[in-house]
Every structure is written in C-alpha cells, then in structure tokens.
Amino acid sequence: MKETYYSLKDFELSYEKNAIERANDFQQYINQLNDFGCKSYWITSYTGVGSTMTIEGFSEPVISFIANDYLGLSQREETKQAGIDAIKKYGTGACAAQVIGGYLDIHQQLEQEIASFVGQEEAILFSSGFGANAGILRALLGQNDIALIDPYIHTSAMAGLKGTNIKRIGHNDLEYLEKVLKEVKGQYQTKLVIIDGVYSQDGDLSLLPEIITLCKTYEAMLMLDDAHGIGVMGANGRGTAEYYNCLGQIDIITGTFSKSFGCVGGFAAASKKIIQYLKFYADSNVFSAASTPQVTASILKALEIIKKEPQIRTKLWENTNYLRKRLKEEGFDIGKSVSPCLLYTSPSPRDRSV
C-alpha cells in the first residue's frame, strides 16, 4: 500500500470546509504525530537559547540549531544588565504607542544609531520584525502601485502586499526582472522591488549591485529585507549592503532585532521623508505599544558590542565554515549556501520526519 505523507501545507485555508472542520482535521493530524513520537513544533524549552538547550522529552541538554541568535548576544551579561537597568529607570513597559506618548529617549537613540549603522538617514522602530515589513508595505503601496518580489522573501513582506499589485520574479533572475521592469514602466504610480539580503530558505545572497542598477535604470524603488544579513555580513557587520559596498544606495532597508541582536523587534530605515510618512501611516507602529525599555536598551548594548567586537563575527564564520565543510565531507546536500543559514535537503518524506 502506498504511504501518504502530510505536511502543514495540506491544512491551510480551504474553501471546501469551515473553520471548525479544518481545525478538527488538523487536530487528528497532530494527534497522529504525537502518537508516532514525531513532535517537531511547540516544544517546551527550559533554558534560554544557546549552543545547547534543555527541552521537553530529553533528560540531557541537546545541541541547538533552532535559534537565530547568530552572535550569542541574548546571553551576554552586558545586554542582560542593560535591560535590567532600563527597567529600573523606565519601568517594565512604554504602555503607549510611540505616536502618542510611548516614545522614549532610548527609542530615539536606537532609531538614530541603527539608521547610521545601515547607511540610511532615519529609522522607525516596530515591536516585531514581522510588523516592520507588513506595516511599511501596507502604508506605501496601494491599488495603483506594484511590488516586484523575489519568491523567497519573508512571509511578513507578503502580509503587507494584500492591498496592492504583485508580480513575482524568478529567484535572483536578473534577466526576468529587467523584462518585468520594462513591461510595467509607466503603468503604476510606485514600482517597488522587494528582495532579501540573505535568503534564509537556501542561504544564498541577493545579487544586490545588479538589482540596484536595474532599479535606477527603470526608476523603481528598492526594498532590502536584511534580517539575516545585519550583524553577520560585511567587514563591520553592517549587512549585505556593506558586503557589496552598496551602503547608501538602497531606498528602504528593513531588519529584525531577533537575530544578530539577540532580542526582539524590527525596524525600517530610509530617507527622512519616507520615515516621517511611515511614523503616521505604518499601522503596525501607530497602533502598537512601543517596544519595552528593556528590549530597547538591550538592543542598544548589542549594537555597541557588534561595533566593538568583530571577533564574535569572526567566530561565527569559523563555526559556519567548519560545519559546512564537515557536512559536505559526510555527503550531505546543503545546497548553495554562502551564509550561516545552512540547509539540509533530505531525499524522502520519511527521512524528513526523522
């Protein structure tokens, strides 16, 4: 008998069943996974993130490959203490949106420092990286605009594009991107090309210099989501733009504080005029409470460490290159990754479940 394997994709929104029916079907799937001992999601951790973690189902610590804390800054004493000191000074929360009173001086300081770090004029903060991408795109693009997107961009960006026109380009396909830019010229008010700096799905990089040239040639704006690049790429950790020597040549850079900074939150950095507009029209900022004082202070300290301690980035790359080398020696297919995002592709559904 042919075995049937299901994935989470099989239980996405379907118009054939109502919400309760879909939830019931999905619960049966989860029950089967648990019965088979294949629980892969929502696993309880009893420690913070690190190279090893203590999790449910294991009596001893296990080696961890699940976190994005690239530089280990979530566990540095300096970042912890900065957060503690901020709580003592400001309290546990801003308790208001930034636009109406939750805008602390350390929020302003972080905006200025992160904007300068990624080579932009100004920045706006968000409570999550997801909110940064989704919020700014909802604010900037409407029915008379179009987004030209790489198929591997983050889901958070896709969430912000539901009210505008979308055209998918091939992954790093410069020829097709140019073709589409020619086709849409003069048809839309705003043309925005959206790419990642480092693509987490397969670990490769965007062809940023060439894409910048195409955007300038065909008068399109460019948004770079550098969630996996900032803190990691470039001689000083300033991201994919620094790696390619393209700082200051990108219209909008977005990022998250949940990866190299070891915390939580997100930002967008752009020209002063664009940021001023977003501070009033990016709904995920305007209608969300500001980041907590602890989070903001810890991020500021993390940014300070990233600037002053290049050796932690060097160590990350040493570990990355060692793991890549050993995996290849053992015959694993890790694709075309050139970043700390290493992908292992297994040959069968059965292997993927192990």
Label every model-predicted segment.
Residues 1-10, 23-90, 220:
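N-terminal "arm"/small-domain region of PLP-dependent enzymes with the aminotransferase-like
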Residues 69, 171-224:
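Active-site phosphate-binding strand-loop segment of PLP-dependent enzymes
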Residues 81-128:
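Conserved N-terminal alpha-helix of the aminotransferase class I/II PLP-enzyme fold
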Residues 128, 149-163:
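Substrate-binding/gating loop at the entrance of the active-site cleft, primarily
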Residues 136-155:
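Conserved PLP-anchoring active-site segment centered on the Schiff-base-forming lysine
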Residues 206, 300-338, 342, 346:
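Conserved PLP-dependent catalytic core of the aminotransferase class-I/II
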Residues 236, 242-277:
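Active-site PLP attachment segment
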Residues 344-354:
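Single conserved hydrophobic/aromatic residue that forms the stacking wall/gate
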